[in-house]
């Protein structure tokens, strides 16, 4: 695992290049190159996350929408601030220039669908209703069991730093209760604030 120093920047082109390489590898390994991907958007908030009691999710407040890509029978999703419909082969999507948020969301949703199809992940769609709160607790437990405690006394490891990509309110609440958390988000309303 490569660990970066705290002040070291992350090159998004490098990250997407790595993801592109993996998507192309999976495309070859599973014979998906010519397989058509159909991206439908926007999913309604109810289709995307159900009807959770908490109403501060960006898709509910209207700041984001969700794309869904389907590869064979596997679906993958990605949040975006640019809505649209799209249809292309997995190979075309894997090689397209990622010049705007719509294209990046199509790429991410397709990658999520492909890794789901390949059996590398069990879930590639957003959880619904009250599941985001349960999911945050499960993620918190998973992190604590593997990385989060300094010793057997269950003292939180206050040196553990967690990065959350995208504004996920319940996950942020759960992680911030025990750890140092940084959140990246494209929505300027979420930048620089404390939640």
Residue ranges and their predicted role:
Residues 2-169:
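Electropositive, gly/pro-rich neighborhoods at or near active sites that engage anionic ligands
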């Amino acid at each position: 695992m490569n660990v970066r120093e705290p002040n070291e920047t992350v090159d998004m082109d490098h990250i997407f290049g790595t993801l592109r390489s993996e998507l192309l590898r999976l495309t070859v390994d599973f014979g998906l190159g010519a397989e058509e991907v159909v991206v439908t958007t926007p999913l309604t908030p109810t289709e995307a996350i159900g009807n959770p009691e908490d109403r501060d999710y960006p898709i509910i407040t209207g700041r984001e929408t969700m794309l869904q890509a389907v590869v064979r029978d596997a679906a993958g999703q990605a949040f975006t601030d640019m809505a649209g419909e799209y249809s292309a082969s997995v190979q075309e999507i894997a090689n397209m220039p990622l010049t705007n948020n719509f294209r990046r969301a199509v790429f991410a949703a397709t990658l999520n669908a492909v890794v789901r199809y390949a059996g590398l992940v069990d879930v590639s769609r957003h959880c619904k209703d009250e599941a985001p709160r349960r999911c945050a607790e499960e993620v918190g437990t998973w992190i604590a069991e593997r990385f989060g405690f300094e010793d057997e006394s269950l003292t939180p490891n206050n040196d553990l730093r967690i990065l959350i990509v995208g504004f996920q309110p319940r996950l942020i609440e759960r992680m911030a209760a025990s750890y140092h958390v940084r959140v990246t988000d494209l929505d300027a309303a979420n930048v620089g604030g404390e939640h």
